[in-house]
Regions:
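P-loop NTPase motor module signature
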Residues: 1-229
Length: 229
């Protein structure tokens, strides 16, 4: 599947609107920051379009903060290509690996990349490292980013670094790594805030959450996404 075919097939995803711009920008810059709200397709469509737009044969590593996310995103990308996970797209997390000699995109957790860098600071065979959900800061992610950036600056000036995160103020990050910023607008939905008539007891938060979900089911059709403390 070509870059153009990917964009056509998944054109409903907002990230498809910036796919060509992202590839064109990386043709002239070694680092790039991409901001996009949830649901834009940045974690699934953009890595595939980046792979199709690359002129070299090296791998893309994409870091996710959680193992479940790494597996699910790899499975989704493989499905988008009409393949099984472990072919063009695979993943590696603690105690589990689904990659093959054909794998060109590996979705990893930060700890896996850190161990790779300790074993081989050159990241031989890797052309691009993508830090997804960069706004979810942690000690592991900061260490992995620092080591990758050091490799890019001191050893591999051909290594490309892409940061993807939710739409927040990225000016400081952009200045620190001297990277341009591309924004995907995403889909905008109306938001209505409703407050409970009674303040729940802080020691019975589980009951309060259950009550809110039951109320939502009664008042609305469709699915529910609950953010839990």
């Amino acid at each position: 599947m070509t870059l153009e075919q990917l964009i056509r097939q998944f054109g409903k995803l907002p990230a498809s609107q910036i796919a060509v711009q992202v590839n064109d920008t990386l043709a002239h810059h070694q680092s790039l920051i991409i901001t996009a709200p949830p649901g834009a397709g940045k974690s699934t469509l953009l890595p595939l379009t980046l792979l199709k737009g690359m002129k070299t044969r090296g791998k893309i590593l994409m870091l996710e903060p959680r193992r479940i996310a790494a597996r699910q995103i790899a499975e989704r990308m493989a499905d988008m290509l009409g393949e099984k996970v472990g072919e063009t797209v695979g993943y590696r997390v603690r105690f589990e690996s689904k990659v093959s000699e054909r794998t060109q995109i590996e979705v990893l957790t930060e700890g896996i990349l850190t161990r790779m860098l300790v074993g081989d600071a050159t990241l031989d065979g890797i052309d691009m490292v993508i830090f997804d959900e960069f706004h979810e800061r942690s000690l592991q992610s900061d260490l992995a980013f620092a080591l990758t950036r050091q490799t890019q600056l001191l050893i591999r000036d051909d290594l490309q670094l892409v940061i993807m995160l939710a739409t927040i103020n990225v000016e400081d990050i952009s200045k620190a790594i001297q990277a341009p910023v591309i924004e995907s607008k995403g889909k905008m939905y109306p938001v209505e805030v409703k407050y409970a008539q009674e303040t729940p007891d802080r020691f019975h938060i589980t009951q309060a959450i259950a009550s809110a979900i039951v109320r939502a089911y009664r008042e609305h059709d469709g699915d529910i996404l609950a953010f839990l403390p």
